[in-house]
């Protein structure tokens, strides 16, 4: 998508949130247009959407969302824009008591009544970071992490009691600021529906969606979250735990089918690949020459990749493995980032981007100290449908220093498969076997 021009902001029709003075908004938009013309840094870009960091004061203090409708279907261009809907929903959610940074204003640029672009000006929360990034950086202290888990449970309950059904109920849509007093905000109301207080089935679905993104969360962390959600009622928290676990297999089956379909069709992220006797699928941000070179035995760039040989696979089974690898990486990082799955007469190979310090578990001399991390990771994999007997050391990767565990062979997972009875005990037994203590 082409970035919006400063003149587009002036030509758009703007609707401010309640309480914003139109004259003050006009002055704000003038400064936003000037900032966009000179230093509108693009934070995120896709085919129809861009996100710009805008400095209206000292430092970046606003985000400008821009959506392009010029190639959208006709009926969609006649309707109200996404930005207008998000402003209305965020304002309504805030009125129902949900803490959220309400957008300042929404703008629509139309030509002859047809929507061309829409804009949303959103204030930034100073010092706040989204939970996805917070988890990835792993820089917060245990006390802060526990406080964040409880705050997330309390906010989720507050949203559901207020009738806020957020389709993308995920860690990246929550902002956390640890500065006293610590606070949590909900953001991104583009895919929100407002209802009466949510039914138990709707709550279970949303909690299961959130839980699948928290692949490396321990059982204690999940229980702290559910206790806060259940208002410290331990019996109610256990019931929620069981209901969420029962819903998870259906979500996993749907995810696997969706990612297999997405990753095996040409798009802005994926493309078919055929090179030097290899054919399959790859991410567009991967270097085809480097991938083929590593598979053919060249050592150039080898340190950047991690290769898992899967033996001879039919095209259908290879597509399943490729989709599973994408799902496991996207859903909380249970696998490293998969770059390509390629087949040749030698067999099939899955190529990952090597995480920092990652080695195959069976190559590490001292595995005993990894037993606690193994138990947590294996518990999650068993819940995703992994077969306990198939979880061997050569199918797992580990960071020798950080203790992070990754699955390297996605075919040991069958999404939708019921986890074994006493899954915690089985995970601990597998961890002890792999660490050499059992």
Which stretches of residues belong to each language-model region?
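Short, glycine/acidic-enriched loop or turn micro-motifs at the edges of active sites
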Residues: 126, 171, 191, 356, ...
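C-lobe/activation-segment region of protein kinase-like
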Residues: 185-243, 386, 399-438
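Juxta-kinase regulatory segment immediately upstream of eukaryotic protein kinase catalytic domains
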Residues: 1-41, 240-295
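Short, solvent-exposed loop/turn segments at secondary-structure boundaries
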Residues: 75-78, 197-199, 312, 363-366, ...
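Hydrophobic residue at the +6 position relative to the catalytic HRD Asp in the kinase catalytic loop
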Residues: 169-176, 391-398
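Activation segment of protein kinase catalytic domains, centered on the conserved DFG
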Residues: 137-147, 364-370
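Conserved ATP-binding subdomain of kinase catalytic cores across diverse folds
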Residues: 28-131, 140, 151-162, 166-167, ...
């Amino acid at each position: 998508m082409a970035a919006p021009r400063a003149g587009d902001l002036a030509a758009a029709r703007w609707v401010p949130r309640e309480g914003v003075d139109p004259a003050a908004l006009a002055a704000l938009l003038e400064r936003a247009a000037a900032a966009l013309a000179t230093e509108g840094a693009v934070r995120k870009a896709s085919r129809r959407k861009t996100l710009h960091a805008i400095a209206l004061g000292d430092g970046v203090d606003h985000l400008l969302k821009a959506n392009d409708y010029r190639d959208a279907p006709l009926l969609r261009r006649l309707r109200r824009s996404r930005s207008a809907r998000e402003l209305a929903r965020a304002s309504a959610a805030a009125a129902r008591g949900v803490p959220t940074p309400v957008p300042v204003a929404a703008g629509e640029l139309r030509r002859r009544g047809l929507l061309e672009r829409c804009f949303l000006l959103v204030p930034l929360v100073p010092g706040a970071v989204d939970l996805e990034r917070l988890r990835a950086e792993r820089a917060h202290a245990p006390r802060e992490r526990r406080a964040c888990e409880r705050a997330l449970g309390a906010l989720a309950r507050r949203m559901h009691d207020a009738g806020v059904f957020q389709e993308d109920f995920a860690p990246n849509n929550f902002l956390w600021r640890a500065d006293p007093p610590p606070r949590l905000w909900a953001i991104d109301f583009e895919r929100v529906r407002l209802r009466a207080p949510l039914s138990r089935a709707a709550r279970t679905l949303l909690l299961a969606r959130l839980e699948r993104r928290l692949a490396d969360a321990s059982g204690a962390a999940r229980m702290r979250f559910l206790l806060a959600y259940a208002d410290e009622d331990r019996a109610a928290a256990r019931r929620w735990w069981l209901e969420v676990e029962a819903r998870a297999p259906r979500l996993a089956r749907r995810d696997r089918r969706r990612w297999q379909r997405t990753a095996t069709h040409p798009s802005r992220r994926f493309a078919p690949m055929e090179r030097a006797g290899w054919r399959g699928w790859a991410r567009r941000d991967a270097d085809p020459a480097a991938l083929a070179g590593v598979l053919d035995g060249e050592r150039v760039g080898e340190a950047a990749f991690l290769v898992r040989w899967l033996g001879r696979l039919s095209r259908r089974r290879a597509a399943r493995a490729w989709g599973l690898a994408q799902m496991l990486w996207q859903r909380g990082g249970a696998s490293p980032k998969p770059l390509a799955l390629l087949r040749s007469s030698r067999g099939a190979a899955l190529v990952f981007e090597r995480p920092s310090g990652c080695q195959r578990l069976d190559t590490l001399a001292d595995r005993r100290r990894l037993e606690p991390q193994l138990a947590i990771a294996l518990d999650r994999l068993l819940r995703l449908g992994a077969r306990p007997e198939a979880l061997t050391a050569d199918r797992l990767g580990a960071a020798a220093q950080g203790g992070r565990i990754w699955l390297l062979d996605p075919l040991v997972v069958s999404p939708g498969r019921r986890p074994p009875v006493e899954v915690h005990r089985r995970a601990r037994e597998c961890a002890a076997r792999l660490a050499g203590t059992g």
